[in-house]
Amino acid sequence: LPEYAGEADCSLYVRDLRSGKIFTGKSVHLKKGCWQELSFRIPSWEGALIGEMGVCFDLLMGTEATQTFAGLLDDLWADGTPDYRIDFCQETTEVWTGLHKEVSQFTRLKGHLYLDQGALHLSCADFGEAYTGRYDWKDYTAVFEMTPLTGENNMVNVRVQGAIRSYAVALLADSKIALLKNENGYRVLTDTAFDWKAGRDYEVSVCAQGARLHAEIKEVPVGCRQTQQLQADTAVLEYEDTDHPYLQGAVGVSVRNGSHAKYSSIRMRCNS
């Protein structure tokens, strides 16, 4: 706060685009002639979409209403680990041009990506992928609710570092699931038997902790998605990558070889 500025308190804030609700951090009284550092831990809340963040200055009593306020801002950034859920019934189709449409919160590499009846659909001729999140997420768990519809290469991705680097959990042919590594092309790290069926709902949980990956997949019986009281068999995959592991990255969804999958939600949380 410059010496010539009026008295003011200051706080950081974020705004949810969907509800319009504003969350603010602790208010700090500004000292004239001094740089001060503020921090704000954004709370976890379901279904929110942060579309704005910034600084709020509250002028104090005694400051003339007509006085021009001056405050200096050196840096403003957001970082940290994820703690939120994407429910696709709340996402929207963004129309960029008449022919160019994208799904909110996602970056599409390739494939037919669209929303239908509250779910995200991804299909392809050769391959399709879409990503969300930050490149610098480190240790986290991502839980995907997905339904394979056609084909034998329906996948979810973690530690995504772009189109040529990521890990994936895949529903494959011959009643198998596998953990894959994308090194400008996918290869199988480990696999196991799992009698998955097209048209059924599955919960895929992937924990990335350092160089170790732990994945679980189980069928979600009809009517049990909200209660999570599941009695279905669970398949487990574990692998520690000692060959140039990917230690950070976003999350995503992907299909290959003409496959088509739909996704109901993605839940991300840090492993602290």
Task: Describe every region a protein language model picked out.
Residues L1-C10, Q36-P43, D75-L76, F88-Q90, ...:
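Extra-cytoplasmic beta-strand recognition segments
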Residues L1-G47, Q67, M155-V188, I217-C224:
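Extracellular ligand-binding interfaces
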Residues D9-L12, E37-L72, L76, E203-C207, ...:
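Extracellular beta-strand ligand-recognition surfaces/modules
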Residues T24-L30, G128-Y135, T190-W196, D241, ...:
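Beta-strand-rich interaction surfaces with strong enrichment in secreted/lumenal proteins
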Residues H121-Y186, R256:
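Secretory/extracellular carbohydrate-interaction modules
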